[in-house]
Amino acid sequence: MNRQGKTPRFKRQRRLLTELPGMGKAGALERRPYPPGQHGLQRRKYSEFALQLEEKQKLRFHYGLREEQFRRLINKAKKSKATNWVEALVNLLEKRLDNVVFRLGFASSIPAARQLVSHGKVLVNGKKVNIGSQIIKVGDKITLKDEAYQNQVYMAAKQAPRLPLPSFMAKEDVAGKEQGRLTDEPNLEAVPFAFEPGLVIGYYSMRG
């Protein structure tokens, strides 16, 4: 990716002072570990609203969702039996097909994984699925079409995985081709960066 292509993603991560692996290449905070427009590590003052906004933006930007998409998942999470709806939200976010493809190491970012899915390169239990928002179930098998194992997106991710394989997934090599499964339900610990669930709850409790 060229410098222009990565700059907006890096700026968003710098503004949040958090590396968001789903956005792609690492290193957003390496050279300038402070927000755009700020010179050096000055102490920032936050309002409660600003803290809440930043925490929910971390999740939304990492998983690459528009606000309306994010809210739909929140509404679904709130209807679950979970005592903490943010945990139910994370469960849904982590089980989206585009994220599962990313976490299995088949793509180096969620946008790249979404592209594989939308181009019809991903199979769920042997059937093509081209909807990145599809929720994967425990036990589902995720593979790629034969030609996709030579795809540049897959090859780049295999050579330099963005994240280690999470504990709730498994992967094996079958006849020289990787396949993965969701083996357990993801919980809050599945999120690959630090965030405060209570602040996310606070943000949406004031906004319906």
From Swiss-Prot:
User: Keywords of this protein's UniProt record, alphabetized?
Assistant: Ribonucleoprotein, Ribosomal protein, RNA-binding, rRNA-binding
- Highest taxon in the source lineage: Bacteria
SMART domains listed in its UniProt record: Ribosomal_S4, S4
One GO cellular-component annotation of the UniProt record comes to: small ribosomal subunit
Which residue spans traverse the membrane?
none
Instruction: State whether keyword Ribosomal protein applies.
Output: yes
Q: Which InterPro entries match?
A: Ribosomal_uS4, Ribosomal_uS4_bac-type, Ribosomal_uS4_CS, Ribosomal_uS4_N, S4_RNA-bd, S4_RNA-bd_sf
Any one GO MF term held by the record is: rRNA binding
Protein's GO biological process: ribosomal small subunit biogenesis; translation
Q: Which residues are in the S4 RNA-binding domain? A: 95-160
Oligomeric form and interacting partners? Part of the 30S ribosomal subunit. Contacts protein S5. The interaction surface between S4 and S5 is involved in control of translational fidelity.
Q: Which family does it belong to?
A: Belongs to the universal ribosomal protein uS4 family.
What does this protein's UniProt record list under function? One of the primary rRNA binding proteins, it binds directly to 16S rRNA where it nucleates assembly of the body of the 30S subunit.
Checking HAMAP family in the record gives: Ribosomal_uS4_B
State the name under which the record lists this protein. Small ribosomal subunit protein uS4B
Origin species: Bdellovibrio bacteriovorus (strain ATCC 15356 / DSM 50701 / NCIMB 9529 / HD100)
